[in-house]
């Protein structure tokens, strides 16, 4: 409970979410599109790219943020479409919260799709952010942490992935957002965080305070989950 209180205090404007309404992942993504389209200054989570909308589909404006794909082409030689589209990323990956449920042990994400507890976590709007598809793919279900050196694989986007170690290092500007999201998910759903995670996230939360967009985004997410 102390982590939930800490997260709520840091967020300042995020109302307590106590009801048990379940929103499917597909519906949650549609709600997030509405929230982000309502803010003309909204940008992608990791690279801070402006978002160009065509209907409900978003595309990252790479020129606005200096993002360049790690892979322009796929292994088959085709254009890397995921580098040109917005995807809705779980800040705390589905693997991290799903693997703490029995259904995951019985058959992974597919088995958990039928379980209310998993569906509720999967569709929680507070845990969803718009990311360049390539980064969503590269981050996979890797844990967040610090990576030695500054290997820039995505142009000016300060997002690093250590594939062998299965670790991703996000930009400083969103580390607090990540910390508050993890603490929220842990307390809202009774999920376990390691001692190392709590310590690291605590540092991130203090070094990156709540910004105006968080104050606007989180109440909107809460309202969308209630209505």
Language-model segments: residues:
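Aromatic-lined ligand-binding clefts that engage carbohydrates, nucleic acids, or primary amines
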Residues: 19-85, 201-203, 216-220
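Sec-dependent signal peptide recognition
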Residues: 1-7
């Amino acid at each position: 409970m102390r982590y939930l209180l800490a997260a709520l205090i840091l967020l300042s404007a995020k109302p307590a979410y106590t009801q048990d309404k379940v929103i499917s992942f597909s519906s949650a993504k549609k709600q997030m599109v509405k929230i982000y389209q309502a803010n003309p200054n909204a940008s992608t989570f990791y690279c801070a790219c402006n978002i160009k909308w065509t209907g409900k589909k978003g595309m990252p404006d790479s020129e606005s943020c200096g993002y360049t794909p790690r892979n322009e082409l796929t292994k088959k030689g085709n254009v890397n479409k995921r580098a040109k589209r917005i995807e809705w990323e779980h800040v705390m990956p589905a693997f991290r919260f799903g693997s703490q449920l029995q259904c995951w042990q019985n058959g992974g994400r597919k088995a958990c799709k039928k379980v209310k507890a998993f569906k509720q976590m999967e569709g929680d709007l507070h845990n969803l952010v718009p990311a360049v598809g390539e980064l969503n793919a590269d981050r996979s279900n890797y844990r967040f942490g610090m990576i030695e050196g500054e290997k820039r694989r995505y142009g000016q986007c300060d997002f690093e992935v250590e594939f062998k170690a299965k670790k991703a290092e996000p930009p400083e500007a969103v580390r607090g957002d990540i910390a508050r999201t993890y603490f929220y998910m842990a307390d809202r759903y009774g999920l376990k965080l390691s001692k190392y995670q709590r310590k690291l996230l605590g540092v991130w939360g203090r070094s990156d305070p709540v910004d105006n967009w968080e104050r606007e985004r989180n109440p909107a997410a809460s309202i969308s989950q209630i209505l």
